[in-house]
């Protein structure tokens, strides 16, 4: 995994970032990567994890639920976890 050939983490979709993160975890678990390379891909994995968390947070912030009045009629929307 050469950092020069890799796309910028922020340019990856959630699915692309998760897929690359899974490859990194697999390589580290196998233990057949040199120490310097392990550190390099671990750091990339940390960046991918943070990117995925940010994308998930943004998606959660966009999800809303319909608020109903006492008669059950739609009254507006509110954040999904507001109660």
UniProtKB/Swiss-Prot annotation:
Iron listed as a keyword:
no
> Subcellular localization, per the record?
Cytoplasm
Sorted alphabetically, which InterPro entries does this protein's record hold?
A: Exonuc_VII_S, Exonuc_VII_ssu_sf
- Entry EC no(s): 3.1.11.6
Q: GO CC annotations?
A: cytosol; exodeoxyribonuclease VII complex
Chief subcellular location: cytoplasm
What is this enzyme's catalytic activity, as reactions? Answer: Exonucleolytic cleavage in either 5'- to 3'- or 3'- to 5'-direction to yield nucleoside 5'-phosphates
Q: Give the protein family.
A: Belongs to the XseB family.
> What name goes with this protein?
Exodeoxyribonuclease 7 small subunit
Source organism: Rhizobium meliloti (strain 1021) (Ensifer meliloti)
């Amino acid at each position: 995994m050469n950092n020069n050939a890799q796309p910028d983490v922020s340019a990856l979709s959630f699915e692309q970032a998760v897929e690359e993160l899974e490859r990194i975890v697999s390589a580290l678990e196998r233990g057949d990567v040199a120490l310097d390379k392990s550190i390099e891909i671990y750091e990339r994995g940390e960046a991918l994890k943070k990117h995925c968390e940010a994308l998930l947070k943004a998606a959660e912030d966009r999800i809303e639920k319909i608020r109903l009045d006492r008669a059950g009629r739609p009254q507006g929307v509110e954040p999904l976890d507001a109660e």
